[in-house]
């Protein structure tokens, strides 16, 4: 990780978050992290994917994102859905869903890193749950596009910093099957 960047949550914050959400006390040795700085992908789609995989086990998140890459299952869109196609027959209750293939591939790489970090720390990978997933804006790469009559238009390529934190939980509180939070309209 670059020196100028740090994780957004400390170990104490993660321990408090897990106790608040799952009612389980953990130690800092049960925490695994993964960080991917300056990934060239869409920030908006990254936020949606990060929100979606939060609360899943590692295996659930990996299988879902692999299905997104194969275009079998979409990712539901909650925030950035203005001027998007709303389907007449909603997908499992979500009228707006997308297949962000490039973002899913990058998140699969970060999940692979997270799984290796969990194994290195001696955690049981089957009981590891993603408790924090964040996608922050990175720096912008300036580009120039030539236009007609000698003009030029500047456009910036965006980058995203992806951060995942996972915790080993007891079997009693593991999510059995991932359920979508359906929105009642």
Curated annotation (Swiss-Prot):
List the SUPFAM superfamilies: Ribosomal protein L22
Q: List UniProt keywords, sorted A-Z.
A: Ribonucleoprotein, Ribosomal protein, RNA-binding, rRNA-binding
> According to its UniProt record, which protein family does this protein belong to?
Belongs to the universal ribosomal protein uL22 family.
Record function comment:
This protein binds specifically to 23S rRNA. It makes multiple contacts with different domains of the 23S rRNA in the assembled 50S subunit and ribosome.
A Gene Ontology biological process in which this protein takes part is: cytoplasmic translation
Q: How does it assemble?
A: Part of the 50S ribosomal subunit.
Its name, as the record gives it, is Large ribosomal subunit protein uL22
Pfam families xref list? Ribosomal_L22
